[in-house]
Amino acid sequence: MKKAIKLINCLIFFGLVSNFSFAESYKNFVNEEIASELEEKGIKRIIHEDSSRDLVLLPNFEYSSKLLENRVEEKKKYTFISESLYLIDKSEILEKSNLSQDTVTIEDASRVVRSISKMEGMTYYSLHRKEESILYEKSYMIDSLETQNRIDDVNTGNADGQISYVLQDDHSFGECRYELRYFQNENSIYAVFKNVDSMGMGIFRVIDPEDMRINIIVTDCGDKFLLYLETETNCPKNKLIINKLEDSLIARVDAIYKWFVSSY
């Protein structure tokens, strides 16, 4: 009887351990300096204001090489690049969520990054206007680029290989369609947003089709998520446009982070 109880306890123990056996520490993906700053502040951000296109915060993720394949084409324009790296405690997500489970998995994160409709009505702080504004008046998946019929979020099951199309009515850029591609394994989810339409600010066409990317990689690190957000776009070399564009895109990254941590 005692042997049977010991065997059961061992099975339970190894079962629990196996849930985290593939989850690596976030320290395996970043250097000591970045790890220390993440531990202290929870975020590390770099805005590239020169001609360098090197992504200095991109962790050594499995999908990092895939991200590098999905960057905007280098052109004779001003290129804006923003990198943000977040260390997120899963317990903080659970406190704000409707989940009844005792942890958050990569499957949960996969569902969230495909819950595009939950972006609708989300707000951001406009650095230019110095006020809170609605970022997306509309945000939903569509059945195709041709018919553009609204459909429910396709956010169940494994996301690997999924291609979706999205329509968003953006406070800064107006109505725009995006192509979304997803890649997923047992520990990570990677999503890349690519604009299908040109994007404008007022009377100016600021961003050409396929000239904007929003890259999102989430990796499970046991009791934490390591979240990497990168935005980049080409735009005219006009100081006024550049300033407004940078303010808008930085605020957008902050809004995407809030969407990720609050949509469970």
Language model features: what each stretch is:
Residues 1-9:
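Bacterial N-terminal signal peptides that target proteins for export
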Residues 9-18:
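Bacterial N-terminal signal peptides
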Residues 19-23:
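Sec/Tat signal peptide C-region and signal peptidase I cleavage site
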Residues 169, 184, 193-197, 222, ...:
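A mature extracytoplasmic/lumenal domain signature
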Residues 200-242:
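Beta-strand/loop substructures that line and gate deep hydrophobic ligand-binding cavities in soluble
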